[in-house]
Amino acid sequence: MKRTKFIGLGIALATLLSFSSCNDKMKNETTVDKSEPTETVAVIETPDYFMLRPAVEKAYGYSHAVKIGNSIKISGAVSMDDQGNPTAAGDLEQQMKNCYADLEKVLKHYNCTFDDVVVENVFTTDMPKFLEFAGYRTEIYKNHFPTGSWLGVKELAIPEFMIEIELEVHKAE
């Protein structure tokens, strides 16, 4: 019985010492920053909206692009004329070129180039055909390729559209 009490007392003492040791270690590792407090200033950035084809975009209820700070989100570009009518019906290669031409106009509005693009998402109703012409992108992205996804979809907003390309841009100031 004495031995059991002694062992129990030893365990209790060891536990107490380990807690004490942890507290001492924390006290030694804890430092107090005695420097002057700093003030954090939040910058409120107003979105800058851009419409490539205002009448069409108002009719469908979207903006082609919005810039907030150094980031620009560009809505999916499709092959259409200024009245919103599909162009190059049945010709995915030409539709893709038309998309990039429109995207370039938006980029230029914000003084950007395809070198500033960090994300490109492509939606197509004909992935095998898109893969045939995807090499055209090397003419667009001369220095590096952005991240992104290529997605095969059942349909786009208007049946004649075969491809839609959306971008995200980061412009260092």
Predicted regions and their residues:
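N-terminal presequence-like segments and the immediate start of the first folded domain
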Residues: 20-98, 105-110, 115, 124-173
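Surface-exposed aromatic
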Residues: 118-120
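Bacterial Sec-dependent N-terminal signal peptides
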Residues: 1-32
